[in-house]
Amino acid sequence: SVEERLTISNMAVEVGAKAGIMVPDEKALAWIRNRTNKSFEPVYPDQNASYFNKMTIDCSILVPQVALPHRVDTVLPIDSIGEIPIREAFLGTCTNGRSVDIEVAARILKGKKVHPDVRFIVAPASREILLESIRKGWLEMIINAGGVLVTPGCGPCVGTHQGVPGDGWNVISTAN
């Protein structure tokens, strides 16, 4: 999806790249057209462009990963870390507070309760996603399960507010 491409581009920079650029295709252009009535001109690479490094990754062979403190690029396969009790679960921010993320969480939590020792915080990536999540009832499911909603956008990933964990807390988070 376009949203997944945006996440990959954002995370490329988080792990040290200067940029994470994807050539726009019709799907990306339609996504932009649906969000603005202003004209725009897509940017494409020159026909004879040279690259320092060009990577192709077969995502179908990737296994779920978990980043360990305190860097997003210190990762291990999730199956290799064993069971670790958590104190906070954070879903959201600009990178991973997408509609699909919130929908999946809502469906998992429907009819269930968040553990009383766990603080579950949801930060939609944007106002648009917040409104969609309200309309579709996803946030109601999450709140009924014991989750907490915070304003869309940045927060604990920059260490400023809305979900900054307590000392010694283990946190599972989609934030970058």
Locate predicted features.
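Fe-S-dependent hydro-lyases/dehydratases of central metabolism
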Residues: S1-N176
